[in-house]
């Protein structure tokens, strides 16, 4: 549903209207549009590739794209803001007709997307995993992955002569823009579509970005608080911490909103920022979630109150990550302290279940690089080795059915995971898994480090009993 007053404004199409997008990018655009003249505003259209967000999309559509964002500080101060940047909500269909039509319209200048690390289907060498059934189906013409959907969208855009387009990653994949571009090029080449590949090279930019705002899955409590504070019975409110950050590579081929007006940082090189965020925030978050689950805790902030879990996180960053990332344009010690303070926010109520998910993507993406760099410089990664050891213990709980919740992992091979934990030497089996470790798999240094980490984790667990 388009607001007529904004009908011909430049359009940003976002794929994935989940909580994070609505607490982050949509908030930025709302703030930008409020600060610029009407003629400089952009409109936001949202849709989805998969039919797994029907309730959210229906609620957004019923509210004309508007919804309430609740933010909360570590001190418990709550604020409420009605976000009005979404001008159109696309209905889902199996052929993605509305999504493709919108992205192929000349008014659309940016298509952005938020996917998990596994949603890129890339191995450690940035090669497409063509053995994955979804990707294999898309190579035959289906539209179930980001690549298949965007290939159809780009083909239609090229046919219409709709002009250049920016494809913008808004997620936690390291070097997301460059790696997505490599994946998209490989996908088109494997399809044998030389003409579309040439058009892509000449007409599409793919900026990298670092995004940050802790955004839990909404609960009914959020809706209740929103109603009490605003009087609005919002069917799709979203809640997040007060902290927000967005660092974007300045690489837009068809224009962009003035993101910096709302506080985004436009830079030539995102790499130092994303490395700090992925290793210090994302990996530490996973550490706390896995440890907290093993300790019988429910929320992230509870783990931060546990002296041993806090120490696991603090030592990992201080002893191993900061030396790996030095020198840096960031004050890494200060960043560490801010991150740990954010994790201790008891009002966000971020669950271990949410943060613990997708370990088979997080080990290679968030943790393995620090181990590899420690090995390369001759350092013993004592603190970092605790993190994969925690995940191995967590994986054993999953296999035995003792986790207190359903574990979600988009790329885990369940049979392979069970074979790891059932092996006579589960540490060696774990460290030999190439999906987790890539070129590190099977190395003696890795096995020894994780075995030592495992001993520390087991001693910690025994002391809690």
Swiss-Prot record:
InterPro entries: 6-PGluconate_DH-like_C_sf (IPR008927), 6PGD_dom2 (IPR013328), DalD (IPR050025), Mannitol_DH (IPR000669), Mannitol_DH/Oxidoreductase (IPR050988), Mannitol_DH_C (IPR013118), Mannitol_DH_N (IPR013131), NAD(P)-bd_dom_sf (IPR036291). One of its GO terms (molecular function) is fructuronate reductase activity. One of its GO terms (biological process) is D-glucuronate catabolic process. Disulfide bonds: none annotated. SUPFAM superfamilies: 6-phosphogluconate dehydrogenase C-terminal domain-like, NAD(P)-binding Rossmann-fold domains. Its EC number is 1.1.1.11. Keywords: NAD, Oxidoreductase. Pathway: Carbohydrate metabolism; D-arabinitol metabolism. It is an enzyme of class 1 (oxidoreductase). Gene3D superfamilies: N-(1-d-carboxylethyl)-l-norvaline Dehydrogenase, domain 2, NAD(P)-binding Rossmann-like Domain. NCBIfam families: DArabDhDalD. Belongs to the mannitol dehydrogenase family. This is D-arabinitol 4-dehydrogenase. It comes from Ralstonia nicotianae (strain ATCC BAA-1114 / GMI1000) (Ralstonia solanacearum). The lineage of its organism: Bacteria, Pseudomonadati, Pseudomonadota, Betaproteobacteria, Burkholderiales. The gene is dalD.
């Amino acid at each position: 549903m388009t607001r007529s007053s904004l009908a011909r404004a430049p359009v940003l199409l976002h794929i994935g209207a989940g909580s994070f997008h609505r607490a982050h990018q949509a908030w930025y655009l709302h703030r930008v549009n409020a600060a610029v003249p009407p003629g400089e505003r952009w409109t936001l259209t949202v849709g989805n590739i998969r039919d797994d967000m029907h309730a959210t999309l229906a609620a957004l559509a019923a509210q004309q794209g508007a919804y309430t964002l609740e933010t909360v500080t570590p001190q418990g101060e709550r604020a409420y803001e009605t976000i009005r940047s979404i001008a159109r909500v696309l209905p889902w269909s199996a052929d993605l007709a509305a999504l493709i039509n919108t992205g192929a319209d000349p008014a659309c200048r940016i298509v952005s997307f938020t996917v998990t690390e596994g949603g890129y289907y890339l191995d450690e060498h940035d090669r497409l995993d063509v053995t994955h059934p979804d990707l294999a189906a898309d190579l035959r013409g289906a539209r179930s992955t980001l690549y298949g959907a965007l290939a159809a969208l780009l083909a239609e855009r090229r046919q219409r002569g709709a002009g250049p387009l920016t494809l913008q990653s808004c997620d936690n994949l390291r070097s997301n823009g460059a790696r997505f571009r490599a994946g998209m090029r490989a996908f088109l080449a494997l399809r044998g579509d030389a003409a579309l590949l040439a058009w892509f090279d000449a007409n599409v930019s793919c900026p990298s970005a670092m995004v940050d705002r802790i955004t839990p899955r909404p609960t009914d409590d959020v809706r209740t608080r929103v109603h009490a504070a605003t009087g609005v019975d919002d069917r799709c409110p979203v809640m997040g911490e007060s902290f927000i950050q967005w660092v974007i590579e300045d690489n837009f081929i068809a224009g962009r909103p003035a993101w910096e007006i709302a506080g985004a940082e436009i830079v030539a090189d995102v790499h130092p920022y994303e490395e700090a965020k992925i290793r210090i925030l994302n990996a530490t978050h996973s550490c706390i979630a896995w440890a907290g689950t093993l300790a019988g805790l429910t929320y992230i902030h509870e783990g931060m109150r546990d002296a041993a879990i806090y120490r696991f996180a603090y030592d990992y960053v201080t002893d191993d990550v900061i030396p790996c990332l030095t020198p840096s344009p960031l004050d890494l010690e200060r960043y560490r302290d801010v991150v740990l303070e954010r994790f201790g926010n008891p009002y966000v109520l971020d669950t271990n279940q949410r943060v613990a998910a997708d370990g088979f993507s997080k080990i290679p993406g968030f943790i393995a690089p620090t181990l590899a760099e420690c090995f390369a410089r001759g350092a013993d990664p004592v603190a970092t080795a605790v993190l994969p050891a925690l995940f191995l213990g967590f994986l054993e709980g999953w296999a035995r059915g003792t986790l207190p919740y359903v574990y979600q992992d988009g790329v885990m091979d369940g049979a392979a995971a069970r074979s790891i934990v059932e092996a006579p030497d589960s540490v060696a089996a774990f460290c030999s898994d190439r999906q987790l470790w890539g070129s590190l798999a099977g190395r003696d240094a890795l096995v020894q480090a994780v075995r030592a980490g495992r001993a520390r984790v087991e001693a910690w667990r025994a002391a809690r009993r």
